[in-house]
Design a protein with these regions (language model features):
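Residues forming the flavin
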Residues: 1-319
Length: 319
C-alpha cells in the first residue's frame, strides 16, 4: 500500500489549487485523485469567460483557465484520473477504484475537494411521465460544449441562476429556441449582468414567480405545465397553462458532495469560513464545503485547506 502525506480527492479548481499551494509550502508525497477522464473540473465544459480574474488578472474561458491551472501543477504531484474514491477510513486508508482495478493507499491528511452535484428533477414536485428531453443544465453544457450535440428545438429552462442563463445562451447559439426561463422566486436567481449578457441578445423572456408542475409526453417531451406561485411559493393550478416544448432544462440548485465525510461520521466546523472538520486530519474545500458563485473563491478555499493541512502535518511530521 502506497503511503502519502496528503491525498486530495477531486482535481477541479479547489483540488488543484490545494495541491499547488501545498507543494509551494514544501509538502511532498501529494496525491490528487480525479474520477473524470481529465483534471480541471467544471471549467472544462465552460466556453464562456469569467474564470481566473483573481489568479491571472484577466477573465478567461473555462477551458483556458483549466489548462493554465493544470500547468501550475508540479510533476512531483501524483495525479490519478478515471479513479473513483469509494471510501476513506478513520485510519487514513483511501480505497480507490480505477481502470486497473481496486487499490488502497494511506494518507496522513486528506482534503475533500469533491465539488457538488445538480439537483435532479426527481427532487422536485413535478408530476407526469419521464420522457426523453429532460436534462440538468450541467449535462446540457457537456453535450453542447464537449460533444457538439444539439439538445433540442423548443426549450424551457427552469431556474434563473447564472448557470441557467448561460446554458440558455449556449442553446440559442446552437440553434434552439429558448421559449422562456422560469423562476419560482420573484427575483432573478443570478446576476443581472448575466441576464443582459446571455438572455437579452436572444430575446429570451424570464418569467418570475412561476414553475413547472407537470410534464407531458411518452417517448419524447411534448409540453410542460407552467404555474404561477403564491407568496408562499405554492403553485396556483387554476392559473396554470400548457406550454409546448421538446426539451426541459433544470437549473434548480446544487448539492455538496459530502458522502465520504458523512460515512466517516465527521462534521464540518460550524464556522462558515472554516475548512476543518471534526477529524483533525480531514479537510473540506470548494463547492463540497459550500456552493460558491465564483471560481476565485473556490480557489481560495483550496488554498486555505492546504494551509490548514500543512499546519496539521507539520505538527505530526515535525517539519
Amino acid at each position: 500500500m502506497e503511503n502519502y502525506n496528503l491525498i486530495i480527492v477531486g482535481a477541479g479548481p479547489a483540488g488543484l489549487a490545494a495541491a499547488i499551494s501545498a507543494k509551494s509550502r514544501g509538502m511532498d508525497r501529494i496525491l490528487v485523485i480525479e474520477r473524470m477522464e481529465a483534471p480541471g473540473g467544471i471549467p472544462l465544459q465552460c466556453l464562456h469567460t469569467g474564470f481566473g480574474k483573481r489568479r491571472y488578472g484577466v477573465e478567461l474561458k473555462g477551458t483556458v483557465y483549466a489548462d493554465r491551472l493544470l500547468g501550475e501543477v508540479s510533476k512531483e504531484i501524483e495525479l490519478w484520473t478515471n479513479a473513483f474514491v469509494l471510501a476513506v477510513s478513520r485510519d487514513g486508508t483511501v480505497t480507490v477504484s480505477g481502470t486497473g482495478g481496486m487499490c488502497k493507499c494511506s494518507a496522513r491528511a486528506v482534503i475533500l475537494a469533491t465539488g457538488c452535484r445538480e439537483r435532479p428533477i426527481g427532487s422536485l414536485p413535478v408530476y407526469g411521465t419521464r420522457p426523453s428531453g429532460i436534462f440538468t443544465a450541467g449535462s446540457v453544457q457537456r453535450m453542447i460544449n464537449l460533444n457538439g450535440y444539439r439538445v433540442g428545438s423548443r426549450v424551457v429552462v427552469l431556474g434563473s441562476g447564472d448557470v441557467g442563463m448561460i446554458v440558455s445562451h449556449h442553446l440559442s447559439e446552437h440553434g434552439a429556441q429558448v421559449l422562456a426561463v422560469l423562476e419560482k422566486e420573484q427575483k432573478l436567481g443570478g446576476l443581472v449582468r448575466n441576464r443582459h449578457r446571455y438572455l437579452d441578445p436572444h430575446a429570451i423572456p424570464v418569467i418570475l414567480g412561476s414553475t413547472v408542475t407537470q410534464v407531458y409526453g411518452e417517448r419524447r417531451l411534448e409540453a410542460v405545465q407552467v404555474c404561477p406561485v403564491d407568496k408562499k411559493g405554492k403553485p396556483i393550478p387554476a392559473s396554470g397553462y400548457r406550454l409546448a416544448c421538446d426539451t426541459l432544462v433544470t437549473s434548480v440548485g446544487l448539492i455538496p458532495e459530502l458522502e465520504l465525510m458523512e460515512d466517516l461520521g465527521a462534521e464540518l466546523c460550524r464556522q462558515n469560513t472554516d475548512v476543518r472538520t471534526s477529524l483533525p486530519w480531514l479537510f473540506v474545500c470548494g463547492n463540497a464545503r459550500r456552493v460558491h458563485s465564483l471560481v476565485d473563491t473556490v480557489e481560495q478555499d483550496g488554498v486555505q485547506a492546504s494551509i490548514a493541512a500543512c499546519e496539521y502535518l507539520s505538527g505530526i511530521i515535525g517539519g
